[in-house]
Regions:
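Short N-terminal edge-element motif at the start of the domain
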Residues: 1-29, 33
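Intrinsic-disorder-associated interaction segments
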Residues: 1-4, 8, 12, 75, ...
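Charge-rich, solvent-exposed alpha-helical interaction surfaces
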Residues: 10, 14, 18, 85, ...
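Short glycine-rich, low-complexity/disordered patches
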Residues: 20-39, 99-153
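N-terminal interaction modules that seed assembly of large macromolecular complexes
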Residues: 25-62
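Alpha-helix initiation/capping motif
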Residues: 45-53, 70, 165-170
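Polybasic, proline/glycine-rich intrinsically disordered low-complexity segments
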Residues: 53-119
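Glycine-rich, aromatic-bearing surface loops/beta-hairpins
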Residues: 132-181
Length: 181
């Protein structure tokens, strides 16, 4: 049985540790995102800095929103340490349950996998909300997001972003989501 509460707690600890480690080196981190693989076998943290954003683009450029919000273009990525341990646990569970999670004839995910995926996503979202509470005093302007490649649609991403960030930032994110997603 997958321990979703342990998974959530470990994510919070990993995100906090990663953010504090990065903050020692970078004083202009503006967005931290939890990245989860579509097959639920790994997680990592990504972040971008104002300096990196300004090196890639400026607010007048057509591609500014792409560089501001597209995780794949960001400067910082962490999949080691606690994230690696969490990913190992995720991968082991997926491998042990492969016969239940994948239809052997179609190679498509099963309903059972979809249920597991929903619980994983819920745990990730709770972890990010908890992170918001725990780091708000030290990082009041830090934006947070959640990314699963080719899984969450624009509306779902914008809705979650709005649930953990300011109204102003959320409106900007939603207005430009087609430029980076």
């Amino acid at each position: 049985m997958f321990d979703y509460k342990k998974f959530e707690n470990d994510l919070v600890a990993a995100m906090e540790a990663t953010l504090h480690k990065w903050a020692e080196e970078y004083d202009d981190i503006y967005l931290l995102s939890l990245d989860c693989a579509r097959d639920m076998t790994s997680v990592g943290m990504m972040a971008n800095t104002e300096q990196h954003l300004n090196e890639e683009s400026d607010a007048e450029d057509d591609d500014y929103w792409f560089y501001k919000y597209c995780e794949e273009e960001w400067e910082l990525f962490e999949a080691g340490g606690l994230a690696k341990e969490i990913s190992s646990y995720m991968r082991q569970y997926a491998e042990e349950n492969d016969a239940r999670f994948t239809d052997p004839e179609t190679f498509e995910f099963t309903e059972e996998f979809d249920e597991h995926c929903d619980q994983m996503i819920d745990a990730c979202e709770r972890a990010i909300r908890r992170l918001r509470q725990s780091v708000h005093q030290d990082f009041p302007k830090l934006l947070l997001s959640f990314h699963i490649r080719e899984y969450l649609d624009d509306e779902e991403r914008a809705e979650f972003f709005a649930s953990v960030n300011s109204k102003e930032a959320s409106e900007e994110y939603a207005a430009h989501i087609e430029d980076f997603n």
